[in-house]
C-alpha cells in the first residue's frame, strides 16, 4: 500500500500468493482493501497479474512484478469510480446477485436468495450503485452467516469461505461480473 493512502476508506493492494511446494510460482494480483468491512477484493485478470517462477533471481523478479502491479492501481481506482457512478436498476442488481449465486452454488439447491445476498451489513453499503451492490454481494458470499434453508427445508446459516483458492476464485469471478455489467450498461 502506498504511504498516505492508508487513512482512506479503501486502498489498492498487491495480493501475493505462493505455491508452497515450490513447483509453481509466486502470483501477484491487483486488489483493493476496504477498511470498513476488512474486505479484500481481488480485481479480475483484465487488470493484469504477474507470475514469478520459483527459479532464477526470484527476489528481483518479485520486486519487478510488484512495480508492475502497482502500475495498474490507477486503473483500479478508475473502475471503482465508474462502478460508484453507475446507478443500478433493481433488475440489474438482481441479475448480478443471481449470477453470483449461480457461480457459488451451480444448479444445486441455493440456501439463500438474491434478496438475502443483496442485504447490506452496514449503512455504507446502502447505495444503489454498482459498487455498493458488488461490495454487499462479495461480503455476504465470503463471510457467510446468512440465514437460509437447506435442501431439506432445515434452517441453516451459510458458511464463510476460508479456503484461499476458493476466496480468490470467487473474488475474481465477482469482479468480472461487476466489470461486465459496468461495460454493458455504459
Please report, for each region that a protein language model flagged, where it lies by residue:
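Intrinsically disordered, low-complexity regions enriched in serine/threonine
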Residues: 3-186
Amino acid at each position: 500500500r502506498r504511504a498516505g493512502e492508508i487513512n482512506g476508506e479503501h486502498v489498492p493492494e498487491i495480493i501475493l500468493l505462493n505455491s508452497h511446494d515450490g513447483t509453481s510460482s509466486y502470483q501477484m494480483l491487483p486488489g483493493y482493501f476496504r477498511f470498513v468491512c476488512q474486505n479484500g477484493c481481488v480485481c479480475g485478470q483484465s487488470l493484469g497479474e504477474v507470475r514469478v517462477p520459483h527459479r532464477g533471481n526470484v527476489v528481483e523478479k518479485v520486486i519487478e512484478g510488484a512495480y508492475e502491479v502497482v502500475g495498474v492501481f490507477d486503473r483500479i481506482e478508475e473502475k471503482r469510480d465508474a462502478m460508484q457512478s453507475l446507478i443500478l436498476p433493481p433488475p440489474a442488481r438482481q441479475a448480478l446477485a443471481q449470477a453470483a449465486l449461480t457461480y457459488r452454488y451451480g444448479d444445486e439447491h441455493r440456501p439463500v436468495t438474491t434478496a438475502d445476498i443483496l442485504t447490506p451489513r452496514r449503512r455504507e453499503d446502502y447505495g444503489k450503485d454498482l459498487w455498493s451492490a458488488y461490495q454487499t454481494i462479495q461480503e455476504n458470499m465470503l463471510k457467510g452467516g446468512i440465514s437460509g434453508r437447506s435442501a431439506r427445508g432445515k434452517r441453516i446459516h451459510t458458511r464463510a469461505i476460508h479456503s484461499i483458492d476458493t476466496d480468490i476464485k470467487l473474488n475474481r469471478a465477482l469482479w468480472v461480473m461487476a466489470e461486465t455489467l459496468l461495460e454493458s450498461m455504459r
